Amino acid sequence: MVHTIGFIKPDYPGERRVALLPKDIKELENNIAIESGFGREMGISDAAYLKAGAKVMNRKEIFQNCDFIFSLKLLQSNDYQYLRRGQTIIGWTHPYGSGRSFYENECIPRDIKIVDLDNITPRLFYRDRVYDLDYIPRNFVYQNSVIAGFSSTYHALMAYGLMPTSRTKVAILSAGNVAQGAYKAIAHFNSRIRMFYRKTMNEFYATIDEYDVIINGIQVDEPHVNIISKEQLALVKKGCLIIDAAAHQGRAIYGTKFTYLEAPIAQTEGVDYYCLSNSPSLFFRTASKEISKAFTRYIYRPSVDKMMAYLKKEGHPYE
């Protein structure tokens, strides 16, 4: 049986990325339906998607006719009315983070499955079980993470009104994709940069009061464990800007919440921070091309039955 994946425009504040481009709609094992205006941010008409073989529907029709719904970012409350029992929602759904309430309160009662396209460990969530989609390789969309580090750093500096110099001391936490993007951005200013890893974090903590800018690229796995705790925030240099390029609200840095384009800088414990969860959208043209290419290869092209087959496995508990 050939299934249809219905793509809706993300209704998340400031989100401009387009997760599927017409040029990538080829040799797919699933049918494609898009919400009218899906490609507008990229200047792509509905006609271009029709020519590529997709169907075009309005938002309500997508939910009514498609058992598999793709939303790049977490569904917002105005879409809950359209959800149908037994559907599957695919995207950056974050059931262990910002999407926990959505999964537990909206999906589980409706028997809705969730596919979280985490770059490191993509997973399928169903009721009280979690299944690692191990046919999707780690870092399958790493370029979006690099863009996240780059865009977060530039945007945060501009929003804060800070142009670093050769005297600016910068700490970058992690050496992963996000941190690489952050390094690429901050290195343009010839600042004094130190990079720290999980094994060298004690060195960072010993010098935390020296930095003018701290950029975090670490995702926190353990609940109730912060990379920078409340006590450590008290040691941070006055006027220091913390950029959470990993955008792990409340987890990486104590007390943080997501910030938004209209107000990208906030404070926790008197320290200014940046925590925009969709910063790659600032470079949406570049990010859209990378996302569409990677997601087509691993998500859109194989039959969605490949994901659903994991339900026959044991999985592990949702916690």
Predicted segments with their positions:
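Adenosine-phosphate binding glycine-rich loop
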Residues: D118-M163, R251-E319
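Phosphate/diphosphate ligand-binding glycine-rich loop within oxidoreductases
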Residues: F63-Q64, F68-A148
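Glycine-rich phosphate/diphosphate-binding loop of Rossmann-like nucleotide-binding domains
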Residues: P10-R40, I147-Q219
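Rossmann-like adenosine-cofactor binding region
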Residues: K199-D272
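Short acidic-hydrophobic, aromatic-tinged amphipathic segments that line or gate anion-handling sites
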Residues: K55-E61
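N-terminal beta-loop-helix "entrance" segment that forms/cooperates
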Residues: A33-K55
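Short glycine-/small-residue-rich Rossmann-like dinucleotide-binding loops
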Residues: K73-L74, T93-H94, I218-E222, A246-A247, ...
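A short helix->loop->beta-strand "cap" motif at the edges of active sites that frequently abuts
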Residues: N30, R84-T88, P109-I112, K237-C240, ...
